């Protein structure tokens, strides 16, 4: 019986063992802290904080800098459906990579797809390629575009297939790239510069376009106004070096054209049934 009793620990011994275990845990915890766990935790916490704010680049006034061009910021007002851009110094809106992809600002805020008005502010010099391309129905409601005088260039397919687009001020623009406004809903165009270049298919299939007034043209590309079936009047104040092939092809309502061209290429006026007069006084080659 005495041997059996010796095999059990007394209450005092049990308490002593528990104290030893607690002391061991405290020592282990001290070792854990001394090995840098607190520092690691602080680093981890700071990384998590950075991660949590990484997607929220907007400032308190609602302007968000573009990732591809931080000098430009944008803001969208959902109440007025207005998408605005501003720049801290002269720079261009970055090109959209390819057809069907989204612009930098669209990726940051998909609400911009509801915009009815776009305002391009001072210091922005160019609208990039495919910026407002509507082939993916990215901007189905876009009706008005307001450009600052700093905007001189419109990139390739920048406003392609915007059938709702009715107005844009191009008075300060000197360069319109390929298919920039093809299949858009524009009704009138006015260029006030004397050195305007209009690219291939720039306004092709603009079925609502009625009048075009240009102070001076240095270049007008093939099919630039092809199939603008409601175009009735085209005026250019200076002599154009060359009217490219099919430039007014299918402009069936064109009846008033005030321009002179040194060279007129093939099919420039094919299927222009309403056209009855053209001044060939400075034309050297047809």
Language-model segments: what does each one mean?
Residues 129-131, 155-158, 177-180, 200-202, ...:
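Consensus positions within tandem repeat domains that build extended binding/scaffold surfaces
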Residues 54-57, 97-99, 174, 224, ...:
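Intrinsically disordered, low-complexity regions enriched in Ser/Pro/Gly/Gln/His and often acidic
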Residues 65-129, 133:
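LRR flanking "cap" motifs
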Residues 1-71:
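Low-complexity, acidic Ser/Thr/Pro-rich repeat tracts that form intrinsically disordered stalk/linker regions
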Residues 18, 30-31, 36-42, 80-90, ...:
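Structural signature of tandem-repeat unit edges
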Residues 18, 22-25, 37, 42, ...:
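N-terminal regions of proteins, emphasizing targeting and processing segments when present
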Residues 109, 118, 132-137, 145, ...:
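A general structural signal for stabilizing positions within well-ordered secondary structure
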Residues 62, 104-105, 138, 233:
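Residues in intrinsically disordered, low-complexity segments of regulatory proteins
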């Amino acid at each position: 019986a005495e041997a059996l009793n010796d095999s059990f620990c007394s209450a005092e011994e049990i308490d002593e063992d528990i104290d030893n275990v607690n002391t061991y845990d405290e020592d282990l915890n001290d070792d854990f802290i001394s090995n840098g766990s607190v520092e690691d935790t602080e680093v981890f916490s700071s990384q998590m904080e950075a991660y949590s704010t990484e997607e929220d680049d907007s400032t308190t006034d609602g302007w968000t800098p573009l990732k591809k061009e931080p000098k430009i910021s944008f803001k969208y007002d959902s109440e007025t459906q207005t998408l605005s851009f501003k720049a801290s110094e002269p720079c261009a809106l970055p090109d959209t990579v390819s057809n069907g992809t989204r612009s930098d600002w669209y990726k940051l805020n998909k609400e911009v797809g509801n915009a009815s008005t776009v305002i391009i502010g001072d210091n922005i010099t160019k609208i990039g390629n495919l910026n407002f391309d509507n082939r993916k129905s990215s901007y189905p409601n876009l009706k008005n575009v307001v450009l600052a005088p700093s905007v001189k260039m419109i990139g390739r397919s920048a406003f392609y297939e915007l059938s709702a687009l009715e107005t844009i001020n191009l008075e300060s623009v000197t360069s319109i790239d390929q298919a920039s406004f093809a299949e858009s809903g524009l009704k009138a165009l006015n260029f006030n510069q004397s050195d305007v270049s209009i690219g291939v298919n720039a306004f092709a299939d603009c079925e609502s376009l009625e009048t075009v007034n240009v102070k001076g043209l240095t270049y007008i590309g093939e099919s630039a106004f092809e199939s603008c079936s409601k175009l009735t009047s085209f005026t250019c104040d200076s002599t154009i070096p060359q009217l490219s092939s099919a430039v007014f092809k299918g402009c069936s309502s064109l009846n008033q054209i005030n321009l002179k061209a040194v060279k007129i290429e093939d099919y420039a006026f094919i299927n222009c049934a309403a056209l009855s007069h053209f001044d060939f006084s400075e034309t050297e080659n047809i």
